[in-house]
């Protein structure tokens, strides 16, 4: 029985001697982990602070970077919306610009006397557009100033009429073009320059 007690006590001593080593190993492990992040653990007050400062900006920097990326996509859409030259290039703003142009064309028929044309329905009067404005809707206003582009044949859009019931075109446009209607049948209206 004495021998058994000694064996137990020896095993306890071994366990106690092993457990402090494991605890010392565990205490050594964090210290071994610390040097890779902080190269010199000899002066802990000064070195860990720079390491913490270096890790803190890295943690803070990723947050502002997405915030910086978020505003950057927003200004480019605002710039095309404010500049008239870039709006037609984007498909979405084209629709509002055409919608905005439609009320202008609705105002124009009042100044143009399409009522004198006997075939006013053929002059797109049903759409609320004067036949002089149809040409502007189908082609851009800068068509004549574009290099390499000739004036399209008006017979593509209108039939050749006899010239009667002429009234001056919208005051906004050049006075060289007139809104004229002929006495012919349907489709006898012509925009001539």
Swiss-Prot record:
Strongly expressed in testis. Faintly expressed in epididymis, ovary, spleen, kidney, lung, heart, brain, epididymis, liver and skeletal muscle. It is found in: Cell projection, Cilium, Flagellum. Residues 17-35 have a biased composition (Low complexity). GO terms for cellular component: sperm flagellum. It holds the Pfam family SPATA3. The keyword GTP-binding does not apply. The keyword Metal-binding does not apply. Residues 1-92 are annotated as: Disordered. Its main location: other. Residues 1-16 have a biased composition (Basic residues). Residues 36-48 have a biased composition (Pro residues). Keywords: Cell projection, Cilium, Flagellum. InterPro entries: SPATA3. Transmembrane segments: none annotated. Disulfide bonds: none annotated. This is Spermatogenesis-associated protein 3. It comes from Mus musculus (Mouse). The gene is Spata3.
């Amino acid at each position: 029985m004495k021998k058994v007690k000694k064996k137990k006590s020896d095993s306890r001593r071994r366990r106690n001697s092993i457990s402090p080593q494991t605890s010392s190993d565990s205490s050594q492990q964090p210290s071994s982990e610390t040097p890779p992040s902080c190269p010199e653990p000899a002066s802990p007050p000064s070195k860990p602070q720079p390491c913490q400062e270096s890790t803190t900006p890295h943690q803070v920097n990723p947050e502002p970077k997405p915030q910086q990326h978020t505003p950057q996509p927003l200004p480019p859409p605002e710039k095309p919306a404010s500049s008239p030259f870039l709006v037609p290039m984007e498909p979405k703003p084209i629709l509002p610009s055409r919608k905005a142009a439609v009320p202008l064309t609705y105002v124009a028929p009042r100044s143009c006397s399409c009522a004198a044309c006997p075939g006013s329905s053929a002059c797109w009067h049903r759409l609320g557009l004067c036949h002089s404005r149809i040409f502007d809707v189908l082609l851009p206003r800068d068509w004549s100033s574009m290099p390499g582009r000739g004036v399209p044949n008006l017979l593509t859009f209108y039939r050749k009429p006899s010239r009667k019931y002429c009234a001056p075109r919208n005051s906004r446009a050049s006075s060289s073009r007139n809104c004229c209607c002929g006495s012919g049948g349907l489709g006898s209206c012509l925009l001539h320059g």
